Amino acid sequence: VGNTVNYLILGGAGFIGQHLTQALFDLKERHVGVTVIDNLTTSNRGATERFKEYKNLYRFIEADLTTMPDEEFLKIARKHDKIFHLAGSVGVENVDRNPAETLFNNLALANKLIPLFQQLRNRHVTFASTSEIYGEGPFNEEDNASIGPSSKLRWGYASAKLTTEFMIRASTFPYTIVRFFNVAGPGQLGDYGMVLPKFVNAAKNNQDLTVYGTGEQIRSFCHVKDAVEVLIKLSDTTGELFNIGNNSEPIMIKDLAEKVVALSGSESKIVTKTYEEAFSKHYGDIHRRIPDLKKVHDATGYTPKHSLDDIIRDML
């Protein structure tokens, strides 16, 4: 089709990448082609099988972006109109367990890819950053970044993502940066520390749901379908930073656990664990994290459609 828009999704076999792929194929107003490059470290091969129905419009390349030869990457990328860079090590528990590996990987990706994006000149890149950069807040795009204490390795992840943001801003290719706040939904793995899939998996199996600390930490969850819908809209803007999340239903983690048990009809019990029992000495938690969404709303009209109950039901 002459007017096909071709998208390259780096890390596209992951949780957000899969939903983004589906949302692109579901677009009514444009024909799309999607190519995914992913090393499948935090996703499974089945993630790519479901797009077989799109035949030659979907292509999956299993490769490690940090070691892929430059010319090979450029040759692939030049066939695409827009790039989503979602690749990277994720998850607070993953970062806590493998601090050096997650840091090196995220910085290696930046060092490798950003000069290549620069060579592509006019290809728009949307980079997935993180709400971790705000530390304890405030959570507005114009506020200062405020990562936590430098003695706690947890904040290395935020620092690597922030460094990547600066490297992108220092370049001359068109970009959009998004900071995701607690995006959740079907297909998300709990293995890396994402709280909702961990709770849902436990409830499904009538196992204990483990709440860390007092359970009074406050979070606000965004359905992945809302997140990828606005992510696509934002890929048509340039030079800006946006929060993506849902601020309508902040909830304490202990109440979230009770909600999951109630909605699932599970016989699970809720147990508590101290941070010391659960994590390394490098772990630090954020008490409250709720996004400021005024900027993304003003730019796109974004208002999340899915409630927290919707998210949990879709995951059950």
Where are these regions (language model features)?
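SDR active-site strand-loop-helix element
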Residues: 10, 37, 83-87, 125-131, ...
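C-terminal substrate-binding subdomain of Rossmann-fold SDR/epimerase-dehydratase oxidoreductases
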Residues: 23, 182, 203-316
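N-terminal Rossmann/SDR dinucleotide-binding element
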Residues: 2-79
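Catalytic helix-loop patch of NAD(P)-dependent Rossmann-fold dehydrogenases
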Residues: 97-100, 104, 108-115, 124, ...
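Conserved short acidic donor-positioning loop in nucleotide-sugar-dependent glycosyltransferases
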Residues: 39-40, 131, 247-248
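Helix N-cap/beta-alpha junction loops of NAD(P)-dependent oxidoreductase domains
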Residues: 45, 91-93, 136-137, 186
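NAD(P)H-binding glycine-rich loop region in Rossmannoid oxidoreductase-like domains
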Residues: 65-105
